[in-house]
Amino acid sequence: MKLSVKFLLFLMILPLIAGEDMSDNDAPKSVDVQRNVKRQGQSQFGEQCTGHLDCFGDLCCFDGYCIMTSWIWPCNW
């Protein structure tokens, strides 16, 4: 029991020691930055594409163009 409490305390303190800034409901800032980095050759909204990986962020390739979708309509059609 004592060991599990110490382990949980360690897991709670670890991000503070590592210097990661955590907000209430967000992932670490490093993850947000990596998620928003545009890869070379990715298309923006309305630009031409050949597949879902060609589109930036949450955009999907539909009928040769990058479009916005929602979680209700994912890119896997």
Curated annotation (Swiss-Prot):
Residues making up the signal peptide according to the UniProt record: 1-19
Main location: secreted
Subcellular location as annotated: Secreted
Propeptide feature ranges: 20-37
Disulfide bridge positions per record: C49-C61, C55-C66, C60-C75
Domain of life of the native organism: Eukaryota
GO MF term list: toxin activity
GO cellular component, one term: extracellular region
Annotated keywords: Cleavage on pair of basic residues, Disulfide bond, Knottin, Neurotoxin, Secreted, Signal, Toxin
Distribution of this protein across tissues and organs: Expressed by the venom duct.
Family, as annotated: Belongs to the conotoxin I1 superfamily.
Record note on domains: The cysteine framework is VI/VII (C-C-CC-C-C).
Record-given protein name: Conotoxin Cl6.15
Organism, scientific name: Californiconus californicus
